[in-house]
Amino acid sequence: MPTLGLTPASLRVVRELGFGQWTPIQEQAVPVLLRGADLVGQSATGSGKTVAFGLPLLERLALDAPQLQALVLCPTRELATQVAGSIRALARHRPGLRVVILAGGTPATPQRQALEQGVHVAVGTPGRVLDHLARGLDLSRVTTIVLDEADRMLDMGFGVSVEKILSAAPTERQTLFFSATFPQSIAAMSKRWQRKPIHITIADNAATKPEIRQVAHLVAPPDRLKALVAILRAHRPRSVLVFCNFKETVRVVTTALTSAHFGAEALHGDLEQRDRDRVMAKFRNGTTHILVATDVAARGLDISGLAAVIQFELATTPATYVHRIGRTGRAGTPGLAIALVVAADQQRLQACDKVSGGGIERLPLPTPTSAKVTASENHTPAVLGAVETLFISGGRVDKLRPSDILGALTGDAGLQATAIGRIEISDRFTYVALSAAVLQQLLRSHPTLRIKAHNFRLERVR
């Protein structure tokens, strides 16, 4: 594995995180970024872009100066949270590094307080960053600005906000655009704000193209719910994202699946941010196996290891269809994409088939014995699992880290490390995956847990 010009500290982290080899975007972009050049990097979602810009970004920071030096803009709060988490992981051997998330859905006051105390990196959404600029955010020491998923930011109407932010930063800086596509709007913005950028395009060839089996089932409109249940029982996906075109349909489908004894959660635009965080924590750690969502609510979600995508209603456009099915089949793992279509959808299905490269199989609804199990690791013996989620009433604002949580649970609480699953820390709360039996026993003996000299409330997430 070549060093790409990275320092020993960066290479140590790469080894510890288990990277066997560089992805194409990483191998080509890292040396360019270490030279300080501007860059337009075009590659698909899930290709390792965060590591590609994160490692060089960290190497350019002056940690002894707690001033904002790098700004990463993302289209959604969820993506900003994921990118910030990745940067923190890459900086594990850079003591003193401070990263703040500047995004909506959470109070702005703690964000302002973090900025006042001094941070090195800010990861945020254009709207919230612009709000902080209006309140005095200082970008005068910023040396690197990254636009992550730049095409989606412009599609979502953030173009004016992004340009206002770029105009508030020093002209002598490194400006990076990462995007899955390179439309004219990105080309025009690059011409205005970048200096002789290097263009890197990673082709979506056979070596990088995900392996996604696409299936369409023709159903009568009144039979959609019955068909969905049949599919879930036949394929038994370990994790599945069910897409609906309207939030009211999300509610109906979630209620129906819950009544049928499937562990399903709804994700739509009416959810408060705390409820959204709770839903996503349960889905990521395996407490919930089925997530029912609209396209808008699912923007920015990067769910690793998603076994299947089911379109309860066919996507309204071919581009949306491609975006939906692209959530599965990542990191070399086969994926399954199923669409329920009615007679009126046939012409749209043909358009989706053409844009996605063909290969949509038109099949009758499966039975448990007829479903093809393409990858055993993507299936579970039962949709309902024995994992539950523990809520801890403290998070990043309390300076909690996963190691603190693990230490308290294995220390004072007496749990075995092997009984503790995914630990997900948000600004003010923490979610931990535990087996149902372990969680029940823990709550009986510990209504609170002492972590870093403070007591935090424990609850079962419902």
What are these language model-derived features?
Residues M1-R462:
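Conserved helicase RecA-like core
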